[in-house]
């Protein structure tokens, strides 16, 4: 592929991305773009970011060869990028630290965030505590119920959690409320968006703070295996963990990039969250991308066993990678993800997040079709502590 260089100056990834927001936000987005460009050019900012990643987050995260699982599947060797071992238990903190440092640099003492599974909310509350900032997290009331433990974590960390009762009471509604708050309190508030979506410069900025995942893999894989993997696999909701591991590999030839979407109860049922598999281009939350919408352009309600994948859109860069044919996107059902969750627990002693379990499930399908000398690298984007209640409930166990 010729050198990949996106987004353009206006935040477009081909026909996707851009800035579709109320005029009242243009100023704030321009201010953010300028502050980010200045921070990128400042070696002190980079040095502080790297220091925080090493000493606060615990990076680099290791890569683990899932030998027993690979043997059991009888095909390709599966390696796991262990983002679940980061402080706060997922990849989200990589981005939150970067944005909190930007907020501090811009003199904004208050940060807000939206969250689905609660992981981004916890990561935001964590960095707000670390930097002494006021923190408000918006969360769909449906997700507040599903993720009670994470809600309590956020409160312990000093954040105010606001349950959102509108719409489907999930991530997209939390995002709408967070946007409203930001418009009202632009003078003192920084909006820490948790995924590679939203208006420019967010998709670029979040990707840049997450690309540390793939950059580490580029160094670690040859050390472990003597070469780069044949395929990199990651789950895709909004898509920040996937973009973080994909981006450094885009110009590396011979490496397949496979994003795994939530097929929920099955693609044929309509109860899923697979916007790249079944969606059409449209505009939501400030950018143009693939969306799950009806004939009238109304967003349809999504479903996934995993709160973090339960979103009707996807980051615009994923939309562009799909159209370019550089990445492929595959759907995995709730039941397939749950099966992979249980298998990894028993075979490797690792409890994965339900989001990550979708990527694991696709790896389990793909590995047996490949030769034993092929290598699959799966981004294990988070740990499964937060999902204990959901998984137990599915198994008929009540705490």
UniProtKB/Swiss-Prot annotation:
Superkingdom of this protein's organism: Bacteria
Keywords (A to Z) from UniProt: Amino-acid biosynthesis, Aromatic amino acid biosynthesis, Lyase, Pyridoxal phosphate, Tryptophan biosynthesis
Cofactors, names only: pyridoxal 5'-phosphate
E.C. designation(s): 4.2.1.20
Keyword Ubl conjugation in annotation: no
Reaction(s) this enzyme catalyzes, per UniProt: (1S,2R)-1-C-(indol-3-yl)glycerol 3-phosphate + L-serine = D-glyceraldehyde 3-phosphate + L-tryptophan + H2O
InterPro entries hit by this protein: Trp_synth_b_CS (IPR006653), Trp_synth_beta (IPR006654), Trp_synth_beta/beta-like (IPR023026), TrpB-like_PALP (IPR001926), TrpB-like_PALP_sf (IPR036052)
UniProt pathway: Amino-acid biosynthesis; L-tryptophan biosynthesis; L-tryptophan from chorismate: step 5/5
Entry GO MF terms: tryptophan synthase activity
The protein's enzyme class: lyase
Pfam families, A to Z: PALP (PF00291)
Assembly notes: Tetramer of two alpha and two beta chains.
Chain's role: The beta subunit is responsible for the synthesis of L-tryptophan from indole and L-serine.
Name assigned to this protein: Tryptophan synthase beta chain
């Amino acid at each position: 592929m010729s050198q990949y260089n996106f987004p353009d100056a206006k935040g477009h990834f081909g026909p996707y991305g851009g800035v579709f927001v109320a005029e009242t936000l243009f100023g704030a987005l321009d201010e953010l773009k300028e502050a980010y460009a200045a921070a990128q050019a400042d070696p002190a900012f980079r040095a502080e970011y790297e220091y925080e990643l090493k000493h606060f987050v615990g990076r680099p995260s290791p890569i683990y060869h899932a030998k027993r699982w690979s043997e059991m599947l009888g095909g390709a060797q599966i390696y796991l990028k262990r983002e679940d071992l980061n402080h706060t238990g997922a990849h989200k903190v990589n981005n939150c630290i970067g944005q909190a440092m930007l907020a501090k640099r811009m003199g904004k003492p208050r940060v807000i965030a939206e969250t689905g599974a609660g992981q981004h909310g916890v990561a935001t509350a964590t960095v707000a505590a670390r930097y002494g900032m006021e923190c408000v997290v918006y969360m769909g009331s449906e997700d507040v119920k599903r993720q009670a433990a994470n809600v309590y974590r956020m409160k312990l960390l000093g954040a105010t959690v606001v349950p959102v009762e509108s719409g489907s009471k999930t991530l997209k509604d939390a995002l709408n409320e967070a946007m409203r708050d930001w418009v009202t309190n632009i003078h003192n508030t920084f909006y820490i968006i948790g995924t590679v979506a939203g208006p420019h410069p967010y998709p670029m900025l979040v990707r840049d703070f997450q690309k540390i995942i793939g950059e580490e893999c580029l160094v670690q894989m040859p050390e472990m295996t003597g070469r780069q993997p044949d395929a990199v696999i990651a789950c895709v909701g909004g898509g920040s963990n996937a973009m973080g591991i994909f981006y450094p590999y885009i110009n590396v030839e011979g490496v397949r990039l496979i994003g795994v979407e939530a097929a929920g109860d099955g693609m044929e049922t309509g109860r899923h969250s697979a916007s790249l598999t079944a969606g059409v281009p449209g505009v939501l939350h400030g950018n143009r991308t693939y969306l799950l919408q009806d004939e009238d352009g109304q967003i349809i309600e999504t479903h996934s066993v995993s709160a973090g994948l339960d979103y009707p859109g996807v980051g615009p860069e994923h939309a562009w990678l799909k159209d370019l044919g550089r990445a492929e996107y595959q759907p995995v059902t709730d039941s397939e993800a749950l099966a992979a969750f249980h298998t990894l627990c028993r075979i490797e002693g690792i409890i994965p997040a339900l989001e990550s379990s979708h990527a694991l499930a696709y790896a389990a399908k793909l590995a047996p079709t490949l030769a034993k000398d092929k290598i699959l690298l799966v981004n294990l984007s988070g740990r499964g502590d937060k999902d204990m209640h959901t998984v137990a409930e599915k198994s008929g166990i009540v705490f």
